[in-house]
Amino acid sequence: MTIKVLVVDDSALIRNLLGKMIEADSELSLVGMAADAYMAKDMVNQHRPDVITLDIEMPKVDGLTFLDRLMKARPTAVVMISSLTEEGADATFNALALGAVDFIPKPKLDSPQDFNEYQDLILEKIKSAAHAKLKTQRAAPAVVVQPSHKPALSNRVINTQLVAIGASTGGTEAILSLLQQFPAVMPPIVITQHMPPGFTRTFAERLNKLTRLNVKQAEDGERLLPCYVYIAPGDQHLEVIKVGGSFKTRLTQGDKVSGHRPSVDVLFNSVAECAGANTTAAILTGMGKDGADGMALIDEQGGKTFAQGEQSCVVFGMPREAIKRGVIHHVVELPQLADKMLNYLASLKRD
C-alpha cells in the first residue's frame, strides 16, 4: 500500500518541488496539492490522505488554524513546513503541541547536493509520519504534580549525578512533558533532540517558560550546574567532558553520527565516559537507532538506563533499538517516566 500524501502550501514553487519529490518515490502517492486551507479541506475529505505536508504561513486561514480544525475533525499525520525565523520556530512548536507529527524547514536549494539532501529528509519524514501514533492514539500526558509530592534528592546526588536525554520525532512534546514533572532542584540535565539550526534556541526558551528548571541552549565550554538543562544546538554535537572536578560542555562540528548532527550517540558516549555510573539516561520517542550504541556504553559503565514505552511514543524506533540491544533497565510509558527516574535518583545513597 502506497502512502497517500497531500501537499498544502501557498507557494506554487514549493508545491511543485514537493510534488516532484513525492512522485519520484514508489512508496508514496501524491493525491493532491492545495494552495490554501479551503482547497485543502475539500481534498482531505475527497482523498483521505495518510500524510499532509502543511505550510505554517498561508493566506485566508493560516496553517495553525487549519491544523487545529483538522485534528478535531479528522486527525491526520501532519509534517509542518516551517520558515527559519523566530516567529516560524514559535509557530512550529505550537503546531507540534496541537498534534503535528514532525516538521522540516523550508528548502534553501543552492546546489544539487542541497536538493538531494532535502529530498531524502522530507521523504524520510513523510514515511515516518505515516507510521506515527497521532496524539489521540498515544498514552495521555501526565498531570503535572507539585514539587511537594516529589521525592527529595540529596545534595550528593544533585552535585554528582548527570541526567542525559535523547529524542527525535515527537521528542519536543515528550521532553516538555518529562521536564514539567521534574522538581526545580535536579542534577544537571543534558539533552540532544534532533532539530535543525534556528529552532533549538526557541525550543530551549519554550521549555524554560513552561518548566520549573532553567533551560538554555548549550554553549561551548560552560560548566554544568544543578537545576539547569542544556539543549544541544542544531547542527552541532553536544558532548560532556570532565575538567578537574566539574562537568563541562563541548560543542563540535564533526561528521554526522547515526545519520545525525547533533547525535544522541555522541552525547550518551561522552556522558558514559566522564560520568560512568553517575549517569541516569532516558531515550525517548524517535525514528531510527541513534542512541542505542550510547545506551550500551552507559549500561556497560554502570549507569541507569530508561526507555519510553511504545504506547506513548510518536515513533517507537530509537527506544525499540536500545531495548533490542538488552541495555535498557526500565521501559516506562511517558506519564510515569519522570517518577521512575526521580525514585531511582532518590534511592541513591544519601549524604
From Swiss-Prot:
CheB-type methylesterase domain boundaries: 156-348
E.C. designation(s): 3.1.1.61, 3.5.1.44
Superkingdom: Bacteria
GO BP annotations, alphabetical order: chemotaxis
UniProt GO molecular function: phosphorelay response regulator activity; protein-glutamate methylesterase activity; protein-glutamine glutaminase activity
Transmembrane segments: none
Disulfide-bond pairs as recorded: none
Family: Belongs to the CheB family.
Function: Involved in chemotaxis. Part of a chemotaxis signal transduction system that modulates chemotaxis in response to various stimuli. Catalyzes the demethylation of specific methylglutamate residues introduced into the chemoreceptors (methyl-accepting chemotaxis proteins or MCP) by CheR. Also mediates the irreversible deamidation of specific glutamine residues to glutamic acid.
NCBIfam families: PRK00742.1 (NF001965), PRK12555.1 (NF009206)
Notes on the domains: Contains a C-terminal catalytic domain, and an N-terminal region which modulates catalytic activity.
Name of the protein this chain belongs to: Protein-glutamate methylesterase/protein-glutamine glutaminase 2
Phylogenetic placement of the source organism: Bacteria, Pseudomonadati, Pseudomonadota, Gammaproteobacteria, Alteromonadales
Gene designation per UniProt: cheB2
